[in-house]
Amino acid sequence: MAQKENVYPWPYGSKTSQSGLNTLPQRVLRKEPAVTPAQALMNRSNSQSTAVPGQKLTENKGATALQGSQSRQPFTIDNFEIGRPLGKGKFGNVYLAREKKSRFIVALKILFKSQIEKEGVEHQLRREIEIQAHLKHPNILQLYNYFYDQQRIYLILEYAPRGELYKELQKSGTFDEQRTATIMEELSDALMYCHKKKVIHRDIKPENLLLGLQGELKIADFGWSVHAPSLRRKTMCGTLDYLPPEMIEGRMHNEMVDLWCIGVLCYELMVGNPPFESPSHSETYRRIVKVDLKFPSSMPLGAKDLISKLLKHNPSQRLPLEQVSAHPWVRANSRRVLPPSAL
């Protein structure tokens, strides 16, 4: 069935793809109100009442497509009570916030247009919004909606109460087999979902992984992601220690880059540092390209087997995600707990 065009406004005057936040499928859980606070956030129109410089006002066609609802007033910052800061970045800050009417707790990411324009990453931000808004999985941080004013862009995100995986790893140094295997199962399941939707994350690392109330993993930060039907890319991106050989060598790459990344992550969680970490960038590059992989004697054989099967120079030889979650070491050690929304 052909998808109806849904053009939603963008503060830089360019048209988005034929998709939008307002086309998100709605799920009604048993024993819950017909419209949950999260759904109300997604249903809300993000069309703006005043034109952004260089842009004509456009009708948000998707606003009336959901549940037969009428057009709603767009969000403004006045709709939220702002709490403590959750994080700071190059382009803005993230705050704990509460939508006043529903009392629903969210993470509000506030980005400064001037910084985004200065760095020329408008397209990257729009791509992040378009991709993340259409991903609904218990191990992917949900983007509920967005709005903007003259100076800022606001992303309304799911709140992950237990914060960054990176900070927990810093505190503990390493994770045990149970926790690492659980993360591997959660990641493989979430990435299988992404890949089926032709989305490659390309920047899986501890800093981009958050933790929900029950400690469940939440993939965040889709800024480097691509939604490419061809699944063939040739741009350099991601984090140095996590870059796969094909990207360093400038070769075409596909979704197999995410398999390499989770192999590197598994090693770092078990050992405390990435497998190819070196004093210089050039040495790190050299070790990655040669797959100069060295395991400490303390590494469990099952984890070693899994990592070795993921960190292959030839992308086609890497262990498929289906086999990651079914790997004997993962099956024996994973303690995955699905959040209520997934039951």
Curated annotation (Swiss-Prot):
MF GO annotations: ATP binding; histone H3S28 kinase activity; kinase binding; protein kinase activity; protein serine kinase activity; protein serine/threonine kinase activity
Its job: Serine/threonine-protein kinase component of the chromosomal passenger complex (CPC), a complex that acts as a key regulator of mitosis. The CPC complex has essential functions at the centromere in ensuring correct chromosome alignment and segregation and is required for chromatin-induced microtubule stabilization and spindle assembly. Involved in the bipolar attachment of spindle microtubules to kinetochores and is a key regulator for the onset of cytokinesis during mitosis. Required for central/midzone spindle assembly and cleavage furrow formation.
Active site (catalytic residues): 203 (proton acceptor)
Tissues where this protein is expressed: High level expression seen in the testis. It is also expressed in the spleen, lung and heart. Expressed in the G2/M phase of the cell cycle.
Keyword Cell inner membrane: no
E.C. code: 2.7.11.1
PTM remark: The phosphorylation of Thr-235 requires the binding to INCENP and occurs by means of an autophosphorylation mechanism. Thr-235 phosphorylation is indispensable for the AURKB kinase activity. Acetylated at Lys-218 by KAT5 at kinetochores, increasing AURKB activity and promoting accurate chromosome segregation in mitosis.
Sites bearing Phosphothreonine, chain numbering: 235
Activity modulation comment: Activity is greatly increased when AURKB is within the CPC complex. In particular, AURKB-phosphorylated INCENP acts as an activator of AURKB. Positive feedback between HASPIN and AURKB contributes to CPC localization.
Species annotation: Rattus norvegicus
Pfam families xrefs: Pkinase
Binding site for ATP: 86-94, 109
Subunit structure of this chain's protein: Component of the chromosomal passenger complex (CPC) composed of at least BIRC5/survivin, CDCA8/borealin, INCENP, AURKB or AURKC; predominantly independent AURKB- and AURKC-containing complexes exist. Associates with RACGAP1 during M phase. Interacts with SPDYC; this interaction may be required for proper localization of active, Thr-235-phosphorylated AURKB form during prometaphase and metaphase. Interacts with p53/TP53. Interacts (via the middle kinase domain) with NOC2L (via the N- and C-terminus domains). Interacts with CDCA1. Interacts with EVI5. Interacts with JTB. Interacts with NDC80.
N6-acetyllysine modifications at: 218
Protein name: Aurora kinase B
Residues that bear Phosphoserine: 230
